[in-house]
């Protein structure tokens, strides 16, 4: 399989996971997460400098997610790095879940910022 097909397949998996998370939670909207799947896959695969085994490395690049409703996209790509399990993705938007509807900072798991309402983040 060539790199282009592999990248497309990975993005498709992010889309499937995002839609599944929202469907299982019966809450949220997957459009943004599905639309951003290719972008976030390329960003994490090709451009971000980070080490999933050393999440507090000072030289790492940081990915800040402003629109928290796109969290299924973030959790999915972080699951590919081993930071979340499929069982944790299934708990999306549940009380006490490690995958809340709007991410809460947890650097050890790859979430660099708490996101809230649109427009409250970085531009």
Enumerate the predicted regions with their spans.
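Basic/polar N-terminal segments that are highly enriched at the extreme N-terminus
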Residues: 1-8
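N-terminal capping segment at the start of a domain
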Residues: 11-27
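Cofactor-binding active-site loop characterized by glycine-rich and histidine/acidic residues
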Residues: 21, 36-123
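Flexible, glycine/charged-enriched surface loops at secondary-structure junctions
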Residues: 30
């Amino acid at each position: 399989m060539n790199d282009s097909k592999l990248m497309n397949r990975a993005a498709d998996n992010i889309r499937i996971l995002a839609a599944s998370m929202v469907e299982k939670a019966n809450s949220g909207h997957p459009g943004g997460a599905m639309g951003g799947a290719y972008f976030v896959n390329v960003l994490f695969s090709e451009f971000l400098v980070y080490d999933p085994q050393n999440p507090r490395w000072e030289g790492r690049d940081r990915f800040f997610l402003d629109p928290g409703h796109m969290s299924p996209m973030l959790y999915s790509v972080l699951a590919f790095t081993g930071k979340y399990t499929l069982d944790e993705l299934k708990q999306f938007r549940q009380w006490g879940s490690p995958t809340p509807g709007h991410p809460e900072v947890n650097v050890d798991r790859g979430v660099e910022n708490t996101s809230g309402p649109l427009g409250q983040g970085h531009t």
